[in-house]
């Protein structure tokens, strides 16, 4: 299964705070499914940023996984 590295940028601090717990819940779901291989914040950046390593069969599947993230649903990444 191919691995993809995804970078999130969160310029909206208030939106991030409002939806971070839903995002974490989604990441836990992906982790349990073996889809999320690693993730974490990128400290030292001006905006909040994170990097995710996601296993997906192709780019279309990756796009669907990212689109289902509560941060994406709320247009925060």
Go through each PLM region and give its residues:
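Conserved, structured core segments of small domains
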Residues: 1-77
């Amino acid at each position: 299964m191919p691995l993809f590295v995804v970078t999130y940028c969160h310029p909206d601090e208030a939106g991030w705070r409002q939806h971070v717990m839903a995002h974490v819940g989604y990441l836990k779901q992906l982790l349990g499914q073996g889809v999320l291989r690693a993730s974490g914040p990128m400290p030292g950046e001006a905006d909040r940023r994170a990097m995710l390593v996601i296993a997906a069969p192709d780019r279309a599947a990756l796009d669907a996984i990212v689109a289902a993230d509560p941060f994406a649903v709320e247009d925060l990444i």
